Amino acid sequence: MAVRASFENNCEIGCFAKLTNSYCLVAIGGSENFYSVFEGELAGTIPVVHASIAGCRIIGRMCVGNRHGLLVPNNTTDQELQHIRNCLPDSVQIRRVEERLSALGNVTTCNDYVALVHPDLDRETEEILADVLKVEVFRQTVADQVLVGSYCVFSNQGGLVHPKTSIEDQDELSSLLQVPLVAGTVNRGSEVIAAGMVVNDWCAFCGLDTTSTELSVVESVFKLNEAQPSTIATSMRDSLIDSLT
């Protein structure tokens, strides 16, 4: 399912949230409305956590993560790190990274198996990515843009890339990521896809300006209409078996 949201009248919600299959981080804000949208969709399946990183609210651009782990920049405070650690599942590894390109969400993007990174990312950061997030790492550009984390969003089901990505590039990226890709936009024509949306395997959140056409493309490529969080599917299956026995 795809849901529209805005953060204090700002439609770039991908800047203020980080969504994975095992947790969701939401920026600390003056209004609870934004948090409530996530809580309403995700409650009972994964923890939704208020957080800031390095004193910033743009947490979606500052960190990178999947269900295995979370990487945050080196200037994240001890207090912030401890708060996130306390709220996330024990299986999720959290690591600070010493990286010149410190807005990790802009220069890296990943699902639970593969990561695309900025061509100039440190070798050490690449190794930490592979180790903590348990992913295969590829240095790549998207539509000749080095900020792969800004112009590409993908889950384990599918992905959305910059609208000017050529068919050849789409095919190459798709074979690397092993998921189908579509070139598109969010927020009524915005090319900065990752700033306008967040997605996991069963749910997507897009900026309030996103048109119904863009929303239907998101639901289609990320296979959201057929997806369910595994915990819900399991409990439904269990109750069905109970009622039949």
UniProtKB/Swiss-Prot annotation:
GO biological process per UniProt: assembly of large subunit precursor of preribosome; cytosolic ribosome assembly; maturation of 5.8S rRNA; maturation of LSU-rRNA; miRNA-mediated gene silencing by inhibition of translation; miRNA-mediated post-transcriptional gene silencing; positive regulation of translation; regulation of fatty acid biosynthetic process
Pfam families for this protein: eIF-6
Signal peptide limits: none
Subcellular location(s) of the protein: Cytoplasm; Nucleus, Nucleolus
Domain of life: Eukaryota
PTM note: Phosphorylation at Ser-174 and Ser-175 by CSNK1D/CK1 promotes nuclear export.
Any one GO MF annotation of this record: ribosomal large subunit binding
Keywords: Cytoplasm, Initiation factor, Nucleus, Phosphoprotein, Protein biosynthesis, Ubl conjugation
Assigned GO CC terms: cytosol; nucleolus; nucleus
Modified residues (Phosphoserine): S166, S174, S175, S235, S239, S243
Post-translational modification Phosphotyrosine, affected residues: Y113
Primary location recorded for the protein, binned into one broad class: cytoplasm
Phosphothreonine carried by residues: T165
Function: Binds to the 60S ribosomal subunit and prevents its association with the 40S ribosomal subunit to form the 80S initiation complex in the cytoplasm. Behaves as a stimulatory translation initiation factor downstream insulin/growth factors. Is also involved in ribosome biogenesis. Associates with pre-60S subunits in the nucleus and is involved in its nuclear export. Cytoplasmic release of TIF6 from 60S subunits and nuclear relocalization is promoted by a RACK1 (RACK1)-dependent protein kinase C activity.
Protein family according to the UniProt entry: Belongs to the eIF-6 family.
Assembly, per entry: Monomer. Associates with the 60S ribosomal subunit. Interacts with RACK1. Interacts with DICER1, AGO2, TARBP2, MOV10 and RPL7A; they form a large RNA-induced silencing complex (RISC).
Record-given protein name: Eukaryotic translation initiation factor 6
Source species: Bos taurus (Bovine)
